């Protein structure tokens, strides 16, 4: 069995169906004896250029180990599913299990955002405590 990296883009109106699609695709691979090494749902993102007058799409990344038969079935599913607007299958030399750069960058952005918001939350909590202490002193 060979290793593959698969990225597919789903029409934004069909984003609710992504979970079911991924489940069907992973089931087809695993039933044929393959493995899913990495599965990342990148969510809705802006496209570099419009595809069929669509400017956003739901991105999904999969790193799998599967047979040629399972891969052909997966590619047929992509081809005949109107919700999948683009797909790319690349053969890899080995399994990739670590997080993708896209997900790492998103997590670091979220961490920075949380750090920026924390000092404001602490300052508000301190002000609230001071006011309640002064209220208790008046009684």
Swiss-Prot record:
One of its GO terms (molecular function) is structural constituent of ribosome. It comes from the Bacteria. GO terms for biological process: translation. Coiled coil: none annotated. It holds the Pfam family Ribosomal_S6. CDD domains: bS6. InterPro entries: Ribosomal_bS6 (IPR000529), Ribosomal_bS6_CS (IPR020815), Ribosomal_bS6_sf (IPR035980), Ribosomal_S6_plastid/chlpt (IPR020814), Transl_elong_EF1B/ribsomal_bS6 (IPR014717). Disulfide bonds: none annotated. Keywords: Ribonucleoprotein, Ribosomal protein, RNA-binding, rRNA-binding. Residues 95-121 have a biased composition (Basic and acidic residues). One of its GO terms (cellular component) is cytosolic small ribosomal subunit. HAMAP family: Ribosomal_bS6. Belongs to the bacterial ribosomal protein bS6 family. Binds together with bS18 to 16S ribosomal RNA. This is Small ribosomal subunit protein bS6. The gene is rpsF.
């Amino acid at each position: 069995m060979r290793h593959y990296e698969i990225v597919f883009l789903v029409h934004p109106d069909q984003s609710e169906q992504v979970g079911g699609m991924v489940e069907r695709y992973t089931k087809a691979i695993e039933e044929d004896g393959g493995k899913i090494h990495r599965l990342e749902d990148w969510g809705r993102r802006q496209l570099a250029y419009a595809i069929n007058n669509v400017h956003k799409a739901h991105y999904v990344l999969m790193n799998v180990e599967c047979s040629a038969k399972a891969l052909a079935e997966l590619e047929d599913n992509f081809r005949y599913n109107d919700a999948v607007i683009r797909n790319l299958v690349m053969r890899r030399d080995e399994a990739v299990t670590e997080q993708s750069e896209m997900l790492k960058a998103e997590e670091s952005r979220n961490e920075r955002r949380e750090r920026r918001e924390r000092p404001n939350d602490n300052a508000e909590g301190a002000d609230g405590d001071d006011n309640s202490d002064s209220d208790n002193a008046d009684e």
